[in-house]
């Protein structure tokens, strides 16, 4: 199961929060982003109860985190599949 956790973070705490988030089991990637949220965290776990533990038990306790929204991925599309599906007659994906 893959989920993305969209985080509101105190602006002064973004680097430290990102570093702490990277150390959490189940967190595979952390991005600093523009827009409504400050950080986006990719979480990969096997079960719903693990996701609940990571999001509420660990991510939510990182200093500087002010709020979150979690979205669960239904399906993953690779770059190659997307490139092929939206190709306008340019280069074909290798593979």
Name every feature range the model reports, one short phrase each.
Residues 1-95:
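A compositional/biophysical signature of low hydrophobicity enriched in polar/charged and small residues
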């Amino acid at each position: 199961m893959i989920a993305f956790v969209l985080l509101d973070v105190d602006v002064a705490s973004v680097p430290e929060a990102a570093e702490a988030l990277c150390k959490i089991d189940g967190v595979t990637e952390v991005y600093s982003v523009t827009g409504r949220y400050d950080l986006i965290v990719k979480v990969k776990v096997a079960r719903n109860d693990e996701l609940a533990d990571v999001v509420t038990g660990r991510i939510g306790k990182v200093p500087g985190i002010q709020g979150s929204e979690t979205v669960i991925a239904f399906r993953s599309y690779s770059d190659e599949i997307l490139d092929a599906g939206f190709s306008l007659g340019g280069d074909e994906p290798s593979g």
